[in-house]
Amino acid sequence: MMNWEYMTILEDNMEKKNTAVVTVVGNDTVGIIARVSAVLAQHEANILDISQTVLSGMFNMIMIVDISLSAFAQLSDSLTALGNEMGLQIRIQRSEIFDAMHRI
């Protein structure tokens, strides 16, 4: 008989292997969410959660995306190129890496 707590942790870890965290920071301009979303859609990444705010003209956004159908390296390159084009810092990290880096 399996421990339910263990099963929950295992399922969470399995889900995280297919998710990534996208962060966007830069001067607020029209169309940031639309353009980032378009790149994600082109790479078949599904947005699971999104939070954005603008503080003193600075745009900040974090997205959780399902990358099960995406080629991670190509998606990362496309987001970096979009960031360079728009003057934004756009980063994508696999969820398990993001969690490990931000664990206290």
Describe the residue ranges of each PLM region.
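A conserved regulatory-domain signal marking ACT and ACT-like small-molecule sensing domains
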Residues: 2-104
